């Protein structure tokens, strides 16, 4: 459906209108033809909109008012940890000594920034129970891939070239099998048992001499803690494999439990989730990777070291997998995460987990009478419901999500994990008040009653948004990803 009341920026163009004027040329003019080969020079002008600065401001301000973010409302996306990002993070990230430096500066001139990076690494080592950390990876999936490449390098250095398989649970994040594939591994699925945890017998069945690693989130994507994690680690390690920790759900165990103490060999973190770097909208993110001692030689170079003369980057890493990102990671997000960790302290981080778990369990118990609860036990930071009973009445989980838009809420994650029918995954985080949770819960209960009494209201939702229902089939099969200038009218 076309958005009728908000013209595209291309549709408000007026030939000859400008938004910015360049100063008069005060140097000798250089022709493009004298600098670039003809293959690199446009034959026709780019079809850019011709608009004033005021046009631009009003257009994008109007669009921004339709966006939904953590600062504007509740954002209960499961497995995304959409917590409030403290604004002190932004103030610190804008310090001139952080914002105005360049990665190609001499190390002697950026010792303060390097000290922050080193201290952040030390904090993450303590939080995760790993032996060292690299800040290079730029996001969660990037961290996954980096960690898997480290595992691959480790096995190959030990002559284990036949370890070509990575095991992932059927409840795993979709990035896990994708990262394994990109890293050159074959993915093997291990089933969950009736309690929503990894089936140990199935794990024993699939682990063998070809196993490179088991990728695991703990608590898992169902919001359940893998209580047999020590036995799982023993199974994998006895077979010569490594245990990989997907840090997407670390918010559930901060200062309560550490991946390193559970037997994990590699961990990636999402600083843009757990440690309040703003996320959503494409980035930037930060996905540091921590490892145990036997994987340190393969970490991407350079690594940051502290000596009696200060901080420096060590490039002398003959066994390293190489670089995984230009320079040293997304520094601005690292500054925000460091600020958050120092502001909270160990007791504050422990409270983060306590309130995140409390909020999730409160919501789960209040909603359980109205939606199916696949796993009736205490959850951690998130939980899953099922819309199976609503589906029997002709209303899909997608319809429920659309109906929530009418009340100003961003919908939860739906249809994931894949092993729960009509899945609704909710993560409230620790930063939401009871009043906010109750408001959302009340609307979820209202929707459940509407399904029983007046299902058409839910099936046809949303009713109050500017854009209603999209043709999802056409959007998937024939997406319109760029503006096409209308053909000139023939007269």
Swiss-Prot record:
InterPro entries: GcvPB (IPR023012), GDC-P_C (IPR049316), GDC-P_N (IPR049315), GDC_P (IPR020581), PyrdxlP-dep_Trfase (IPR015424), PyrdxlP-dep_Trfase_major (IPR015421), PyrdxlP-dep_Trfase_small (IPR015422). It is an enzyme of class 1 (oxidoreductase). Gene3D superfamilies: 6.20.440.10, Aspartate Aminotransferase, domain 1, Type I PLP-dependent aspartate aminotransferase-like (Major domain). Its EC number is 1.4.4.2. GO terms for biological process: glycine decarboxylation via glycine cleavage system. Its cofactor is pyridoxal 5'-phosphate. GO terms for cellular component: cytosol; glycine cleavage complex. It catalyses: N(6)-[(R)-lipoyl]-L-lysyl-[glycine-cleavage complex H protein] + glycine + H(+) = N(6)-[(R)-S(8)-aminomethyldihydrolipoyl]-L-lysyl-[glycine-cleavage complex H protein] + CO2. The modification N6-(pyridoxal phosphate)lysine is found at residue 273. One of its GO terms (molecular function) is pyridoxal phosphate binding. It comes from the Bacteria. Keywords: Oxidoreductase, Pyridoxal phosphate. PANTHER family: GLYCINE DEHYDROGENASE (DECARBOXYLATING), MITOCHONDRIAL, GLYCINE DEHYDROGENASE, DECARBOXYLATING. Belongs to the GcvP family. C-terminal subunit subfamily. NCBIfam families: PRK04366.1. The glycine cleavage system catalyzes the degradation of glycine. The P protein binds the alpha-amino group of glycine through its pyridoxal phosphate cofactor; CO(2) is released and the remaining methylamine moiety is then transferred to the lipoamide cofactor of the H protein. The glycine cleavage system is composed of four proteins: P, T, L and H. In this organism, the P 'protein' is a heterodimer of two subunits. This is Probable glycine dehydrogenase (decarboxylating) subunit 2. The gene is gcvPB.
